[in-house]
Amino acid sequence: MNIERADFVDRVKIFVKAGDGGNGCVSFRREKYVPKGGPDGGDGGNGGFVFLRANPSVSTLIEFVNKRKFMAENGKHGMGKKMKGRNGKDLFIDVPVGTVVKDAVTGEVIADLNEPGKIVCVARGGRGGRGNAHFATSIKQAPLIAERGEKGESRWLELELKILADVGLVGYPNVGKSSLISRISNARPKIANYPFTTLIPNLGVVKYDDFSFVVADIPGLIEGASEGVGLGNVFLRHVERCYLIAHVIDVSGYEREDPVRDYFVIREEMKKYSPFLLEKPEIVVANKIDLIGKEELEKILKRLRDATNREVIPVSAVTGEGIDLLVSKLASIVREMKVEKPERKEEKFVKPSPVWRRLPEKFHLEVVKEDEGYWVVEGENLRVWIERFDLNQRDARLMLLQVLEKNGLNNKLKEAGVKEGDVVRIGDFEFEYRE
C-alpha cells in the first residue's frame, strides 16, 4: 500500500450538523359526511443523524481537506389528517480504519474506529415536534398549538488517523528502512541515497508460511524531532497501535558514526512523544552489514546487545543476508502477541434517541430593562419553551404565561419596576403589561 505524499493527510477538523426535527402541524378535520371533526395535525419527522464509519477502502483523510462541513437532512413538517413528516436521511461519513475521533473543543476522545465497519454517532438529529392532535383535552377540544422540532446537534470534530500495522520500523533517516520494507514485503516505496526520502508512512504486507502481517515504514527521526527538527515526531502516532517496534540501525559507519548513540537518541525522541512507546516489545535491526568487515561487525553487535539489552538481528537489505531470520522473528513475535490479545466481542450498533428536551416547569426568571418602557424576560429554562413553541399561537402563549405566572412572573415584573402600559418581550412575542 503506497500513498503519494500529496494524498496523505492524517489529521483534519470537520464540522458536523445533524438535521432539525420538522414542526408539528395545526390542522382540523373538516370533511363532508364525517360527523366527528377535531384536531388532526400530524407530527414533524425526526432530523437525520450524522455517523462516522470505518471503511477499509479509504486510506487517508484527504477527502476532508476541501470539504469540511457535513449536514444531515432536516425532518419534514407534519401535515393534516395526522400525517407525520418524513424523517431526514441519516448521513454516513466514511473514514479510514484507525481514525480516532475527538471533540475539537474539549479534546475528548469520542471513538476509536479501529475495526472495519465500526460506526459512531457524532451528532443526533432533533425529534420532530408534535401536532395539535396531541394537545386536545376534554376541556380544550380545538387546540391552536403545535410544537416546533428540536434542533439537531452540531460540533467541530478532530479526526486523527493512526495507521493499523503490526510492526513499526523506526530509526534515523537513510538507515535503510525503505529498502528493508521493500525487501520483506509487497511495498514499493521511493528509495534514494539521501535523508528524508520517505516523507509519509509506507505500509507493506509480509507473508511468512501461512501467516501474514503488516509492517509500517515510519519517516526518519532525528535528534530534536520533538521540537520540530526535520519532519518532527508527528508520524510516531502511527506506531502507537503496533504490536512490535523494529528499530533499524545503520552499522556500516559510513554515514552514522555511533550506532549505540543513535539508538538512544531515537528512544529519547520516542519517549518525548509518548512514554507508552517505550513499553512496546522491540528488536534492533542492524542494517548495512554488507558494508563492514566481519570482525568489526561482531564488535558493534556486541556493543549494541550490551547497551540496549535487546535482541539484535544483523541484516543487509541490499544483499538479503539475514532477511529470512528477521522475517521469521517478526512473524513469531506478532503471531504470539495476536494470540495473547483477547478476542473482542462484536458490538451491536444501536442508534441513539433523537434530541428531545423535557419542558421545565420551574424557572429562574430575570427581567431586564432594555429601554425606557421596554423590558425583556430571560431565563435558561425559558429558552426551551421559546424554542419549542410558536408564541404567535394563542394557546401556546396562554400555556406559557400560565407556567410563568406559577413561577412568579407578575411579582418579578413589579419588583423590576415594570409599569402599566410598558412593553414586555418573551422570545419573539411582545405584550403590553396590564396590572
Swiss-Prot record:
It comes from the Bacteria. Pfam families: DUF1967 (PF09269), GTP1_OBG (PF01018), MMR_HSR1 (PF01926). Residues 6-164 form the Obg domain. GO terms for biological process: ribosome biogenesis. The keyword Nucleotide-binding applies. Its cofactor is Mg(2+). The keyword Cytoplasm applies. Its EC number is 3.6.5.-. This is GTPase Obg. It comes from Thermotoga maritima (strain ATCC 43589 / DSM 3109 / JCM 10099 / NBRC 100826 / MSB8). The gene is obg.
